[in-house]
Every structure is written in C-alpha cells, then in structure tokens.
Amino acid sequence: MFERDIVATDNNKAVLHYPGGEFEMDIIEASEGNNGVVLGKMLSETGLITFDPGYVSTGSTESKITYIDGDAGILRYRGYDIADLAENATFNEVSYLLINGELPTPDELHKFNDEIRHHTLLDEDFKSQFNVFPRDAHPMATLASSVNILSTYYQDQLNPLDEAQLDKATVRLMAKVPMLAAYAHRARKGAPYMYPDNSLNARENFLRMMFGYPTEPYEIDPIMVKALDKLLILHADHEQNCSTSTVRMIGSAQANMFVSIAGGINALSGPLHGGANQAVLEMLEDIKSNHGGDATEFMNKVKNKEDGVRLMGFGHRVYKNYDPRAAIVKETAHEILEHLGGDDLLDLAIKLEEIALADDYFISRKLYPNVDFYTGLIYRAMGFPTDFFTVLFAIGRLPGWIAHYREQLGAAGNKINRPRQVYTGNESRKLVPREER
C-alpha cells in the first residue's frame, strides 16, 4: 500500500500527495455544511480514482433543495426549518416549495391545487392494469409498475428537455400517484374503485378513495387529514438518499420523469430504505406477544449482542442527534391515538424511548428515535395495512424526487452518471476448451 494524503492550501485548493507527485484540486464552498473537493481531471493526471463504498464521503451533485446537519439535528427544505413547515404549511405548499424554490403566493397555490385536483382521473382503460397483479402482490411493486405504465398514456409529456412538458408531467404525477396507490389497495381487496371528488382537497380525496364506498357517504375526519398531511411533509425530501439518488441516476440518462420516479419507488421498497416503520411495528408487536410487553427486558437483550436482538426505529445514517422529524411524529402520534382511541403499543414505544434516552449504552452509540419509530403506529391507527406504509412514504417523497429530477436536468454541465470501480477480479486468462475443464 502506498501513502497519500490530502491537505488544504491557503488559496482555496486541496493538494493530494501520492507516490509520484501531487495533484491540486479546487474546493467548492457550500452555503452551509461541508465544502467539497472537486476531483476534476484526477484520473487522467494521476491514474487514481477515489474509492468510497456507500458514498459515505462523496458528494454526487450540488443542490439547493434540502439541507441536513446530522450532528445538530437540522433539516431544512429550501432554507425553511422542517418544524416550521410541518406546523404552518400544507403538503401541497411544501411540494410547490421543493419543486419551484419558493413558497407559493395565494394565487399560485390556488392554481397548483386546482391543477392537481382536475388531473386526478385515470384513463378508464388503465384500471384493467390492476387486474394483472396477483392479489397478494406488494403494493410498492404495483405502484412502481403503474407509474411506469402511466408514461405510456402521456407520451406528449416525456421530453425531459422541454420545460412545458416537465410542468405537465409534474402535475400528472402529483395528481395521479395517490390515485394509483388507492386503486392498488382497492384492487387487492376486491373493493370497487372510487372516483375522485373534486369538492375535496387532495388528502381528503385520498382517504375517501382508500376507505370509502360508493354506496354510502364518506365522513371526512379533519384530524386524520391534518395528521396525514403533516406526515407527508416530514417525508417530502431528505437530500441525496438512496431513492433520490436513483431518480437522479436514471434521469441523468434523460429518461423521462415517469420512469425515473418509478425507479425511485423501487429503490424505496428496499427494507433498508423505506421499510423501517413496518419493522418497528412488527418489533413492538413481538415485544408484546413474546416478551410479555416488558420493555426493560427487551432493551437488555438488545444490549447483549449474543441475543441477536435488533432495536428498530433508532439511529440514522445521517443524524447523530435526535431526528428533528421524530419529535413532530411523536406529538402527532399522541394526537391521533388520543382521537381514535388508545394503543398499548404507543405506551410500549414511549417506554422504549425513555429507556434509550437514559441509558449510556444507547446514548454513546447515538441511538435516538428516528422518523420511522412512531409513524407505523399512526398509519395503523388510521387503518392502513402494514405493507402499505412504504407506499405512503413514496407519496410523501414524490415532490422531492420531482424537484431533484428537475434540478439535475437544469444543472450546468449535466452529464450521465457513470461511477467508477476498483476492479479486484481475475487478470487476463485464456479460455480452456470445454472438454478440458
């Protein structure tokens, strides 16, 4: 192994020292957070590439959308603190903010809401697509496939270099993805599809299409509507995570917005990304059923590595402090469960949190509750099936995906993403004839 190091200079440059020479790199300055070293022609001039599995220290892009300070527990969309937005804005306002860069004026918000409201209907032929999927298909697979298929119905909105087409595709996706999710749910239940009602707002419409029936009026619960809106805001963007990076990767090939978003949905379906709230709920149910509801006993097992017990919903790849979304979700969980009826699993969750926040084992490992710890309890109380939780995550993350897709297309010097690798396979060898192997 050879020695190398990178040092900063006084002229806003960084210098890489490696066997055979030095390589000078520009430093790009962030408005907040970590500055970046621009590798530029490093490969051609040094013969070296960077090696960073999982992109732990690699910035793939410049972005103006979301800022995270994991050490301080800060999350901001376009400069606005997440707590401020969750308390004082609607999901559609936040969606507009992420996609357009500024909060909408009253007229702009009215137009945005109106466009979404009047594009919720699906082509009647589209409904037959849901009959193709098995009743036990995971709704994330159905949703991703449906968004892919949606692109075939809007072939005049597929050019990623046409701003007018991008605007139309943005509205179609914002309007129709929740409808696709609701239809996927109805199809696997064998329940009749519900047409959207333009007299309702987007969240009211979604809940009605999920749980209503055409034979009777659906009673809107404003507390449930507000809670769902708030949860979607909390999930609307989270910088360069796996699914967002997937959307940007696909979009870098100038694939259309529909198929790029479908790729993000597929990435989100992975249990390490979007399935954590389901895992938390399953953990709580396991503690109740198999550990007598004893939170202390369970947490002791977590600390004993030989027991192999995992604590779900604690810790985060980015946050080394309390996830700023978690406190908002916890408060929302209290509100919704108090309204809909108590849940002994909430009491159990609170007990687990209290133990973790007072125990040096968890504190030293920075294992604080994350956004997923309480969301599953809320979704279950609302009546959503457990395997539908990630679909709700996707609906919330949709405006963030759209914002990143569009930002990347408009970036100066945008190129198709093409990571490098360090090859560790066989060196050149001759093919051995089949009969001699």
UniProtKB/Swiss-Prot annotation:
Keyword Transferase in annotation: yes
GO molecular function, one term: citrate (Si)-synthase activity
Catalytic activity reported: oxaloacetate + acetyl-CoA + H2O = citrate + CoA + H(+)
Pfam family, one: Citrate_synt
Annotated GO CC locations: cytoplasm
List of catalytic residues: H316, D372
Regulation: Weakly inhibited by ATP (apparent Ki = 10 mm).
Pathway: Carbohydrate metabolism; tricarboxylic acid cycle; isocitrate from oxaloacetate: step 1/2
InterPro entries: Citrate_synth-like_lrg_a-sub, Citrate_synth-like_sm_a-sub, Citrate_synthase, Citrate_synthase_AS, Citrate_synthase_bac-typ, Citrate_synthase_sf, Citrate_synthase_typ-I
Biological-process GO terms, alphabetical: tricarboxylic acid cycle
Domain of life: Bacteria
Alphabetical list of Gene3D superfamilies matching this protein: 2.20.28.60, Citrate Synthase, domain 1 (1.10.580.10), Cytochrome P450-Terp, domain 2 (1.10.230.10)
EC number(s) given by UniProt: 2.3.3.16
Keywords annotated in UniProt: Allosteric enzyme, Transferase, Tricarboxylic acid cycle
Family, as annotated: Belongs to the citrate synthase family.
Self-association and partners: Homohexamer.
NCBIfam families: cit_synth_I, PRK05614.1
Note: Citrate synthase is found in nearly all cells capable of oxidative metabolism.
PANTHER family for this protein: CITRATE SYNTHASE
Protein name (record): Citrate synthase
Organism name: Corynebacterium glutamicum (strain ATCC 13032 / DSM 20300 / JCM 1318 / BCRC 11384 / CCUG 27702 / LMG 3730 / NBRC 12168 / NCIMB 10025 / NRRL B-2784 / 534)
Source taxonomy: Bacteria, Bacillati, Actinomycetota, Actinomycetes, Mycobacteriales
